[in-house]
Amino acid sequence: HKKLSKRSGHASYEDLIDQGFLTEAVINFVALLGWSPEDNNEFFTLDELVKEFDYHHMSKTPAVFDMTKLRWMNGEYLKKMDFDKFYEMALPHMKEVVSRDVNFEKLASMIKTRIEIWADIKDQIDFIEQVPDYDINMYVHKKNKTNLENSLEVLKEVQPLLEKQEDYSNDALFE
């Protein structure tokens, strides 16, 4: 945790927005620096903040800027965002990474719950443009009894199931 300081890196609102944070998340997060709402709710709209804010709940200790918590909060805002709005805002970021003709809506639905800031999109989808080199030992798993010899057969067996899959969310994949 660091005190908010321009000397310790990006500190302005504009810097945070440029890094891929949502305005709503930044405002919500900053409002909670040094203030605790009565009901311990962490998520507020701007109107709710105006209504709920009470200076009697200000902390006497200095506020600590926790970038990890801001990233988490921003990710929660992205998860709750209406899909059409998410898609519209994510599309330029996806197109920066993927130049091929792909179903960007489906791609957006797959990454919506997996990113915390817009800049995370690149690491989630860059494999579409170029498959990275993988260590072949990732196919070895003693508990699942897979090794370099039988892994190809297992992958061939799973491929038809994955091709039929329409929902690639974590919950759907692990059903």
Where are the language model's segments positioned?
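Alpha-helical recognition segments enriched in aromatics with Gly/Pro capping
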Residues: K2-L78, K85, P92, E175
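Small-residue-rich helix-loop
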Residues: F83-E175
